[in-house]
A protein has these predicted regions:
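C-terminal target-recognition/interaction regions appended to catalytic cores
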Residues: 95-227
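Class I S-adenosyl-L-methionine
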Residues: 1-136, 140-142
Length: 227
């Protein structure tokens, strides 16, 4: 967004918010500080000018120290997780075979990546293991899953399941007693999670803004009581 149309798109957005009477700030935040996914997104905050605040997006606390890796969100496939058909099946809750790429698709992705590499282009599938960080999950993931493929030893890799996508976006976690409800098809789930905002990042932004809103409500409440 920052570079779209040579920055004009962002300028139009900021100008529109300014005209509406908002004091605006923005910041690019990478979700990999919370989740095992490299996902840079612009977060824009806005307070009406009649609300007294010194808030800036730099007030958003970004956790440091722990590196999040894919094993945090992958199905363990060791029996420690209850099977959840159609995502996982059997006594050890193994990922269902349908998430493994077909030999034809895997062959195509390898040839396509090799062709682009030879031409000096940047296309390549994102093959990842349990100790890695994923590429950005996008709404096109349902097509071939190429941006995040999970290694399966020497075999053909697989896509993430929708449940793993929910975890990758911070809506769910391994071992949750109340897993995020996924009432739609895999295709729709991939689209929706790929279009979503990483939940813990949104929570961090909202948590940083909330005290200013609470303070404003308290001030106005006191003024009303005096009247």
């Amino acid at each position: 967004l920052l570079s779209h149309d040579k920055g004009n798109t962002m300028r139009v957005i900021l100008h529109a918010l300014d005209e509406l009477g908002y004091e605006v700030d923005y910041r690019v935040i990478d979700a990999q500080n919370w989740l095992p996914q490299h996902r840079e997104r612009i977060f824009i905050s806005g307070f009406r000018r009649d609300i007294p605040t010194n808030f800036t997006m730099e007030d958003v606390e970004v956790p440091v120290g722990r590196k999040h890796v894919l094993s945090d969100i992958l199905h363990p496939e060791d029996g420690s997780e209850i099977a959840e058909p159609p995502f996982t099946v059997g006594q050890i809750a193994k990922v269902a075979d349908k998430y493994t790429l077909t030999p034809k698709l895997w062959d195509y992705l390898q040839r396509y990546a090799a062709k682009h590499k030879a031409a000096g282009n940047g296309f390549g599938f994102g093959l990842r293991g349990p100790s890695d960080v994923a590429r950005t999950l996008s709404a096109r993931y349902y097509k071939d899953g190429s941006e995040i493929l999970i290694e399966q030893g020497d075999g053909i890799p697989r896509r993430l399941t929708p449940r793993e996508c929910a975890r990758l976006m911070g809506f769910d976690r391994v071992g949750s007693n109340r897993p995020w409800l996924i009432p739609v098809s895999d295709t729709q789930a991939y689209r929706q999670f790929g279009n979503a905002v990483a939940a813990p990042v949104a929570t961090a932004v909202a948590s940083a803004m909330a005290p200013w809103l609470t303070n404003t409500v308290a001030i106005r409440s006191r003024k009303c009581r005096r009247v």
